[in-house]
């Protein structure tokens, strides 16, 4: 008997009936003490559940931050600065709408990568005809090169301003730096290595955010009402050069390469879950850890997809949206109404204007933000280029050589422009890259819409056995057909006929995870809007419309 319990009194038979209530009272006392003891020892279930959810969410932090880097590269600087200097805060609405569209496309990318286990490029190779696949590969490489131009330009300019490094040498330094980091990134390696790499990129993102937070304190922003009213639609968005600048913001925000990146960074955590829970058995003979035959289980998708999408959306609507809005707000506060020709200013001139209108520190912080964002964007752009070349084509050369070649092809035009035209060449390359990306976006995004709406592609087998998770065919999933899977079943001894196979294992059951009707219609509308607006902007350029980007 514990110190908190009371022994019931033993009554005589003749008095038992009259005193049952006394024993009941003692029993109530014991029950009360036991309840208090359990309440003291056990933590609150609600708080414990919240802590567990936060810990689980923390394991998924990383991919969303890497994707958000794609939406705050030097191309965004150029368009946001032009918009802020010309219309002050009125085009914040365009930044907000562009961010919503980008988030919607990334939602589709995450679903495609999780359900199929393949990125967008690999799905193109597996499901599209050869000719169309090659055409899309060429367009994707053009998008990678155009994006890389902007990243290299931003980094080279920031190195030139901060450390007086010649532009040509700055371009070369960006190549060396990105290659070193890229060679250290192994998407099929251990999760520890992947998380270290993601932490490095996240650090650059955080530094960029810190720089613009400081920049906002430097700037004289004016009434808060004026800033927040910029997030509402106004005539400035749809009239004159405001419409063109809004389209430029859209083209600089919804980047083609981010679609390949967003669909290719979700697999490691799915694979980690399947390995831990016995749904996937890696081939011990695969020394390169390629995991080419991996297909996520339904359990892994159900467990991780929600956290993946949540982390992605939080990153886009906090980090990416904040940085893009901060660029426009700072430029609007300092350059709008300036006697200097801010609309025609390049990044060099923007630095000089910030130094003269605010302070030397404000200009330096702006260039530091440009350096951090240029470096991080260059890294993720090169990763996207790797996914494109490996997904569309089955290169047999070593990964290091393949990545080096991809990066070299991307920076060659930029290096030539620097050597031939110098500073003006860099500015021209930055502006031209945004036009090219606007033209390529509809073609690159169309397959994403098709794949995520296909019931045949977006399905997951529910009754997959763990033994079948390890495939005997060395052919990658992107190259495998239904005939290959049938042959594999026969080689594993699971019947050479449909009757024999039905006796060994039940018929496969699939879960449809394709887009619903509402999402499909919304995706088509968004695609048509982006395509139409981009075409309108390009039409303006061809007819001689002056738009300073």
From Swiss-Prot:
Give the bilayer topology.
Multi-pass membrane protein
Give the residue spans that cross the bilayer: 91-109, 130-147, 161-185, 196-214, 312-332, 350-372, 432-452, 521-541
Give the highest taxon in the source lineage: Eukaryota
Disordered: region residues: 1-23
- Alphabetical UniProt keywords: Cell membrane, Manganese, Membrane, Metal-binding, Transmembrane, Transmembrane helix, Transport, Vacuole
Q: What happens when the gene is disrupted?
A: Decreased manganese uptake.
Question: Where in the sequence does UniProt note compositional bias of the Polar residues kind?
Answer: 12-22
Provide one Gene Ontology cellular component.
trans-Golgi network
**Coiled coil (UniProt feature):** none
What is the protein's major site of localization? other
InterPro entries, per this entry? NRAMP_fam (IPR001046)
Factors inducing expression = Up-regulated under metal starvation conditions (at protein level). Down-regulated after addition of manganese or iron to the medium (at protein level). Expression is not changed under metal starvation conditions.
- Please state where this protein is localized: Vacuole lumen; Vesicle; Cell membrane
Q: Which GO terms describe its molecular function?
A: cadmium ion transmembrane transporter activity; inorganic cation transmembrane transporter activity; manganese ion transmembrane transporter activity; metal ion binding
Q: What does this protein do?
A: High-affinity manganese transporter involved in manganese uptake from the extracellular environment.
**Sequence similarity:** Belongs to the NRAMP family.
Specify the protein name.
Manganese transporter SMF2
From which source organism is this entry? Saccharomyces cerevisiae (strain ATCC 204508 / S288c) (Baker's yeast)
Gene name linked to the record: SMF2
């Amino acid at each position: 008997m514990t110190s908190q319990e009371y022994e019931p009194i033993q009554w005589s038979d003749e008095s038992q009936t009259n005193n049952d209530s006394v024993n009941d009272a003692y029993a109530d006392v014991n029950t009360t003490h036991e309840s208090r003891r359990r309440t003291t020892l056990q933590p609150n279930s609600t708080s414990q559940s919240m802590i567990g959810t936060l810990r689980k969410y923390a394991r998924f932090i990383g991919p969303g931050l890497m994707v958000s880097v794609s939406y705050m590269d030097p191309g965004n600087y150029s368009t946001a600065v032009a918009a802020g200097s010309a219309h002050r805060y009125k085009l914040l609405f365009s930044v907000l709408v562009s961010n919503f569209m980008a988030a919607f496309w990334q939602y589709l990318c995450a679903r495609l990568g999780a359900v199929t286990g393949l990125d967008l490029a690999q799905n193109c190779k597996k499901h599209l005809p050869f000719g169309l696949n090659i055409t899309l590969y060429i367009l994707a490489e053009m998008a990678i090169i155009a994006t890389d131009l902007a990243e290299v330009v931003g980094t080279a300019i920031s190195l030139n301003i901060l450390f007086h490094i010649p532009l040509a040498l700055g371009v070369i330094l960006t190549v060396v730096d990105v290659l070193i980091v890229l060679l250290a990134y192994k998407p099929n390696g251990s999760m520890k290595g992947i998380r270290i790499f993601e932490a490095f990129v996240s650090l650059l993102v955080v530094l960029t955010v810190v720089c613009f937070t400081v920049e906002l304190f430097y700037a004289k922003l004016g009434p808060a009402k004026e800033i927040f009213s910029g997030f509402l639609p106004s005539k400035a968005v749809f009239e004159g050069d405001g419409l063109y600048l809004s389209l430029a913001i859209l083209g600089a925000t919804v980047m083609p390469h981010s679609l390949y990146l967003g669909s290719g960074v979700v697999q490691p955590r799915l694979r980690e879950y399947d390995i831990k829970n016995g749904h996937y058995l890696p081939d011990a003979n695969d020394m390169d850890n390629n995991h080419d035959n991996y297909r996520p289980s339904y359990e892994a998708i159900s467990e991780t997809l929600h956290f993946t999408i949540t982390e992605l959306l939080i990153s886009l609507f906090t980090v990416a949206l904040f940085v893009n809005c901060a660029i426009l707000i700072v430029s609007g506060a300092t350059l709008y109404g300036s006697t200097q020709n801010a609309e025609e200013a390049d990044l060099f001139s923007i630095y000089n204007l910030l130094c003269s209108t605010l302070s030397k520190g404000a200009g330096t912080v702006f260039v530091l933000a440009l350096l951090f964002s240029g470096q991080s964007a260059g890294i993720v752009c090169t990763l996207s280029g790797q996914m494109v070349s490996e997904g569309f084509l089955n290169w047999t050369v070593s990964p290091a050589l393949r990545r080096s070649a991809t990066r070299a092809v991307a920076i060659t035009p930029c290096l030539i422009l620097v050597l031939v035209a110098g500073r003006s060449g860099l500015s021209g390359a930055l502006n031209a890259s945004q036009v090219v990306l606007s033209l390529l976006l509809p073609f690159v995004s169309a397959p994403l819409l098709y794949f995520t709406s296909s019931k045949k592609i977006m399905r997951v087998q529910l009754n997959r056995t763990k033994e079948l998770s390890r495939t005997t065919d060395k052919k990658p999933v992107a190259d495998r057909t239904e005939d290959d899977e049938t042959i594999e079943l026969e080689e594993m001894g699971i019947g050479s006929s449909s009757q024999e196979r039905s006796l060994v294992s039940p018929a496969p059951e699939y879960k449809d995870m394709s887009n619903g009707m509402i999402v499909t219609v919304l995706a088509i509308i968004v695609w048509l809007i982006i395509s139409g607006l981009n075409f309108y902007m390009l039409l303006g350029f061809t007819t001689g419309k002056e738009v300073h980007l």
